[in-house]
A protein has these predicted regions:
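Membrane-embedded alpha-helical segments in integral membrane proteins
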Residues: 1-11, 73-77, 155
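Transmembrane helix interruption/hinge and helix-loop junction motifs
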Residues: 8-13, 163-167
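Acidic (Asp/Glu-rich) catalytic motifs at the cytosolic membrane interface
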Residues: 9-40, 137-151
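Aspartate-rich (DDxxD/NDxxD/DxxxD) Mg2+/diphosphate-binding motifs
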Residues: 35-53
């Protein structure tokens, strides 16, 4: 719809809105591909599975959003500021921005609710920082980006209507482009931490230790290391101490019991490696 309104009105703000909508569509497509590929079974070449595929495809979409969508919006806005051009059919422009703001605001609200529900927290920022659901985090950022873009577009439209200065159409597109670039950087920072090997939260580590110590035969836990292997799924390496007098069979039973207890208590564990530290 936005591309049609952009053609009708000759507004670069609406063109930026259309580009932002295209970025949403592209990102959704890449997320779908990444999510699908991340569910592939482990094989001889990828023995820990394909969970990290979703990070790669999300990164591709974010790079396209930063270098294409944001750049074009900034360029179009800058050119309109230098060479102002008339805007026609302004009611269509306002209607397009209003619809974009309403739909993106609603989608943003739903994304935030889902994020907080998954993390069992009402604190939006903490939920965002702690969540390992990269697809939900990406959707939340995209919806917020769309909401802010429409808001900035409306502000630019109002100022243009009050002043009659066509340059504000360019300023609006410029700000939208900067907004898209900033949101892209936020996603890049989040993706970097997961690609580099981000560990689970301190609360999850605490739960792992509690479950281990509650397992019969485990005397202590000397080390816990974790790393996300995809959306919410992570691998766990835990070092435990047991009684020196135990036989190999008894130690094996303890390790098997510990793995079962951990998998039952924490559903997101994909692989567990238990090592003895005596």
């Amino acid at each position: 719809m936005n591309i049609g309104v952009a053609i009708l009105t000759h507004s670069v703000v609406m063109l930026s809105e259309a580009l932002q909508g295209f970025a949403d569509l592209l990102t959704s497509g890449f997320l779908l591909i990444g999510y699908s590929r991340s569910k592939k079974r482990a094989d001889g070449e990828f023995q820990f599975g394909y969970g990290k595929e979703i990070y790669f495809w999300t990164l591709l979409s974010v790079l396209a959003m930063f270098f294409v969508t944001a750049t074009l919006s900034i360029v179009f806005g800058y050119n309109r500021i230098i060479k102002p051009e008339p805007i026609i059919n302004t009611p269509f422009m306002f209607a397009g921005l209003a619809v974009a703001f309403a739909t993106n605001s609603y989608a943003c609200l739903l994304s935030i609710k889902r994020l907080c529900k998954n993390m069992n927290s009402k604190n939006i920022w903490q939920s965002f920082m702690r969540s390992a659901l990269i697809e939900v985090k990406t959707a939340s950022v995209l919806d917020l980006m769309g909401t802010l873009s429409a808001f900035f577009g409306i502000i630019a439209f109002i100022i243009f209507m009050l002043t009659g200065d066509y340059r504000y159409d360019g300023y609006g597109a410029l700000i939208i482009g900067i907004n898209i670039a900033c949101m892209s950087v936020v996603l890049m920072i989040e993706l970097r931490s997961f690609i580099a090997g981000k560990s689970v939260s301190s609360q999850t580590i605490k739960t792992i230790k509690q479950v281990a110590l509650a397992t019969r035969g485990v005397r202590g836990v000397s080390d816990i290391r974790t790393m996300y292997q995809g959306s919410e799924k992570f691998m766990l390496n835990i070092d435990i101490t047991v009684n020196d007098s135990l036989t190999a069979h008894e130690i094996g039973v303890i390790i098997d019991t510990l793995k079962v207890n951990l998998m039952s208590a924490i559903k997101n564990i994909r692989y567990i490696q238990v090592e003895l530290d005596n």
